[in-house]
Structures are given as structure tokens and as C-alpha cells.
Amino acid sequence: QDLPGNDNSTATLCLGHHAVPNGTIVKTITDDQIEVTNATELVQSSSTGKICNNPHKILDGRDCTLIDALLGDPHCDVFQDETWDLFVERSNAFSSCYPYDVPDYASLRSLVASSGTLEFITEGFTWTGVTQNGGSSACKRGPASGFFSRLNWLTKSGSTYPVLNVTMPNNDNFDKLYIWGVHHPSTNQEQTNLYVQASGRVTVSTRRSQQTIIPNIGSRPWVRGQSGRISIYWTIVKPGDVLVINSNGNLIAPRGYFKMRTGKSSIMRSDAPIDTCVSECITPNGSIPNDKPFQNVNKITYGACPKYVKQNSLKLATGMRNVPEKQTRGLFGAIAGFIENGWEGMIDGWYGFRHQNSEGTGQAADLKSTQAAIDQINGKLNRVIEKTNEKFHQIEKEFSEVEGRIQDLEKYVEDTKIDLWSYNADVLVALENQHTIDLTDSEMNKLFEKTRRQLRENAEDMGNGCFKIYHKCDNACIESIRNGTYDHDIYRDEALNNRFQIKGVELKSGYKDWILWISFAISCFLLCVVLLGFIMWACQRGNIRCNICI
């Protein structure tokens, strides 16, 4: 394509930037829809569908809940002394022992999950005057009746059940978790058959706390052939403290303690399969990459994960403002510089030059300005990820029915946090996009001004991103302009002379229009005079008669 106004004594140099036929729409602070040459998606909207077992240690609960594994349900014995980073509970988990309830189930589950271990230490509790190791047909261990392996069901010995008073000090330097329980018989007959007394009582104390439980005797819905229940309780004994257990019946005693650890282990409900792969971020839907700052896969996460937002898509501009190249314009197929449109097909840079001189036409990228823009944009995605990705986990929240108001408040807080992060993400991306577009526009303007300062009076700004150079400028001359070594003094005299000649020709060419208009006016006047004279002559000879009626 030819550039306008060229002959052997002049040249034309245009500056422009990269463009693509179909850009990407992004949002900025000042414009909801602006087209750029390239953009990166910031929201991860899909998972792998599987949970990766690396770098986190994943423990698959299979058909056991964490609490069943903690108590020692017979079908969960494989989990004894296990450790994990993330315990995965399955929807098909079930209990196969004596029916029980945990009044503070959510707290116990969360406490054990964060500890990341089921390491159990057996202690020598002395239970005098009672029968130990009680079992039930509802809790088969093999063909025989059994019970939870971490608990000791105490019943009467003969016809007596003495008052039990046992102490166990914590002489170690770590917290100890003791699990114990209270049996609620279904009938008074069952109560006396097991514990002699018509009503038992269990009190468990430390220096910091005390719990007293009185059994509730009564029939309940049948579960695995039992209408009685066991309530599970737990006590933490600090270093230097003492555990005191006092009971006259219905005690489900501890066999030892669980060693508590501090850490960032957690628990998650998921039916996604566990596979051999690597992923830092895990959701109930499966693992997701954490190479994006945001995700809308699931609010529940574990590991170094993107922030959860409501948006399905947020695009970060990683290219310049896109102005697709116009089709050939004008009689000679002229094209303009960056002020009118971008240039398609410039694959070796973002900014560049097009020229036409006596040696022909050419195009070259300006690598320095291109690299300056790329260097500033490349770090944007990493900076956004650093601002949002943190090593934390958002666990599931569970509340009992009596804690409904707390659950509502928790849900409100979580929803508010998500709303805030969604808004912050929108603003953050819009700000970064605005900065990117301003930055790339600035680099184009810098290159244009740099070229203008080099050419000075040797060229004229054509107003469309191009310069008309008023001296002969071969390819070596064009290259010197591009690389900044152009010396305008060398060409100044030639440029001034050519400028005056070209302007003079343009001035003389302008008089032709005036002459044409004057000639046309005189011709019209003479034609009117001749016509009028002919009419007057014809009237005098009588060839034309003119009647005027009033």
C-alpha cells in the first residue's frame, strides 16, 4: 500500500502500533467495554473433578466419618493412629456400632480435623469393683459383640456398682484430648440391670472446667436393634492439669487420650475421587489450579487457593488498546499512522514504523518501546495473584438446631465477605486494565515525540501519526531515525529548500482555482451581453415583437 505525498526528493514515515482483527473486551474504571489486543482470564471456573494427593496428604474416609474413626467404630479400625492434611468424608459414610450422639459434634469434629492425627495413647485407668469391656450386639467386631475400641463400657460387678473416683494428671507438655460418654438406657429395668442404681451420674472435671451429666432413661427410635443411646463428650487437659472422673453408674470411660497437635489440617465433605496428581488448592468439586487470583468453583477450599468471587469472568488486559486497521482509503490506497488506526500483521513487536522512500516501502518494529511495555505488563498477573492467593482454608460450618441464629449470622458474614471480595476484584481488575491501556498509549506517544524531536524542521507532522520528510531519505536514513542516530543538521539545508519549493508549487497551484472562477464569470457576462444585443436588434427590425400588458 502506498503512502501519500512521495517522490524521489521526499519520504514519508508513519508510526503505529499492533492491532488484531478481533480483540477482547475488558472493563476499565472509565469504560465498561473497551477492546484490547490481548487479555487473560482471571477467574478459574472449573475443577479437575478429582482430588490430588500431592503436595497435601489426603486421607480418604471412605465409609467412615471422622468421629467414627475417632471413637473406634469396628469398621473404622484401619484409621487408628492415622495422620492427614485433609480428611475427606464421603456421603456414603455410616456408623456400625452402638447408636450415639455428640452434643457438640461440630466443635469436636473441627478440633480433631485441625489436629491432623488420630494418634492414641492408652493409659492405665483403675476401675475397681465394676465390670469392664462391655459390648453390644449392635457393634459387631467379627462374630462377637463388641464396642468402640477407644471407649470402655463399665457395668456392675455382681450386684454392686460402687462410686468411682479416678484421677489422671497431665505431666506432659502437650494438650490431651479425652473422649468419654454417658449411657442412656431405654427402660428402668435396663438401668438397674446394668448399673444397680435407679439413676446414675457422671462428673468429669479439670481445674478449668466441670461437666455433670445425668442419664435420661427412656425409649428412643430403634437403631441397629437398640433403643438406648450413648452421648459422647470430650475434655481437654492442659499440661500440669488433672482429669477427675466421678461416677456411680452409666459411665462410658476413656481408655486413654489423643495427642493434640496444632496445625492447618482440615476436613472436607466430597465425593470426588482421589488421584495421583499435584495441586495446591482443593475444593469439594475437586482440585483446581491456583494460577489465577479468583475462582467461582466452590466457597469451601483447602490450601493455597484463589479467592472465591461471584463473577464468572474477569479479564485482565495484557495488551494495548485495539484499533483494527481500516481498509484501503482514498484514490491511492493511503494508510495512516496510530492516530487513525492500528496495524495488523505486525508480529515482531507492539510498536513500529512504516515508510516509503525512493527505494520503496518497508516496515520494522521498535523493540525498545515494545519491551518497555511488555516488562511493565508481565508482572501484573503475578502481582494480582500475590494480593489474593493466601495459604488458608475455608472449612464447612456446622451448627446444631439450637444454634440456628448463630448459623444465620455466620451465613450473613460469609455472604458479606464474598460480596466484598467480588466488588474488590471488579475494582482491582478495572484499575489494572486502566493502567495497562494508559501505559501502552503512553509508550506510543513517547515514541512519536522521540521521532518528532529527531526530525525537527526537516519533516512535517501530517496529523495522522505520519511525518512528511522534506529531503531524500534512503533506507539507511530511515534506519537512523528508528535507532535514534539521525542527525537533522546533515539534511537541514536540503529539507528547507525542498519545503519552500513544494510549498511554492502548492501556492501557485492555488491561483489556478481563482483564474478558473474569474474566467467562468467573464464568459457568463459576455454571453448575456451578446444575447441581450441580439434581442434589441431583432426588435428594431420588427422580427420580434414584445407586448407588455399591465
Swiss-Prot record:
Kindly list the residue ranges recorded as spanning the membrane. Answer: 515-535
Q: Which GO terms describe its cellular component?
A: host cell plasma membrane; membrane; viral envelope; virion membrane
Give residue spans on the Cytoplasmic membrane side.
536-550
Show which residues form the site (Cleavage): 329-330
Give UniProt keywords alphabetically.
Clathrin- and caveolin-independent endocytosis of virus by host, Clathrin-mediated endocytosis of virus by host, Disulfide bond, Fusion of virus membrane with host endosomal membrane, Fusion of virus membrane with host membrane, Glycoprotein, Hemagglutinin, Host cell membrane, Host membrane, Host-virus interaction, Lipoprotein, Membrane, Palmitate, Transmembrane, Transmembrane helix, Viral attachment to host cell, Viral envelope protein, Viral penetration into host cytoplasm, Virion, Virus endocytosis by host, Virus entry into host cell
Alphabetical list of Pfam families matching this protein: Hemagglutinin
InterPro entries hit by this protein: Capsid_hemagglutn, Hemagglutn_HA1_a/b_dom_sf, Hemagglutn_influenz_A, Hemagglutn_influenz_A/B
Q: Which residues form the lipid moiety-binding region (S-palmitoyl cysteine)?
A: 539, 546, 549
Posttranslational modification: Palmitoylated. In natural infection, inactive HA is matured into HA1 and HA2 outside the cell by one or more trypsin-like, arginine-specific endoprotease secreted by the bronchial epithelial cells. One identified protease that may be involved in this process is secreted in lungs by club cells.
Q: Subcellular localization, per the record?
A: Virion membrane; Host apical cell membrane
Q: Single Gene Ontology BP term?
A: fusion of virus membrane with host plasma membrane
Which residue ranges does the entry give as Extracellular-facing topology?
Answer: 1-514
SS bonds (residue pairs): 14-466, 52-277, 64-76, 97-139, 281-305, 473-477
Q: How is this protein positioned relative to the membrane?
A: Single-pass type I membrane protein
Please indicate if the UniProt record lists Transmembrane helix as a keyword: yes
Superkingdom of origin organism: Viruses
Tell me one GO molecular function of this protein: host cell surface receptor binding
Additional record remark: Major glycoprotein, comprises over 80% of the envelope proteins present in virus particle. The extent of infection into host organism is determined by HA. Influenza viruses bud from the apical surface of polarized epithelial cells (e.g. bronchial epithelial cells) into lumen of lungs and are therefore usually pneumotropic. The reason is that HA is cleaved by tryptase clara which is restricted to lungs. However, HAs of H5 and H7 pantropic avian viruses subtypes can be cleaved by furin and subtilisin-type enzymes, allowing the virus to grow in other organs than lungs.
The record's subunit annotation is: Homotrimer of disulfide-linked HA1-HA2.
What is this protein for, i.e. what is its function?
Binds to sialic acid-containing receptors on the cell surface, bringing about the attachment of the virus particle to the cell. This attachment induces virion internalization either through clathrin-dependent endocytosis or through clathrin- and caveolin-independent pathway. Plays a major role in the determination of host range restriction and virulence. Class I viral fusion protein. Responsible for penetration of the virus into the cell cytoplasm by mediating the fusion of the membrane of the endocytosed virus particle with the endosomal membrane.
Q: Which family does it belong to?
A: Belongs to the influenza viruses hemagglutinin family.
Record protein name field? Hemagglutinin
- State the species of origin: Influenza A virus (strain A/Swine/Hong Kong/126/1982 H3N2)
The gene name on file is: HA
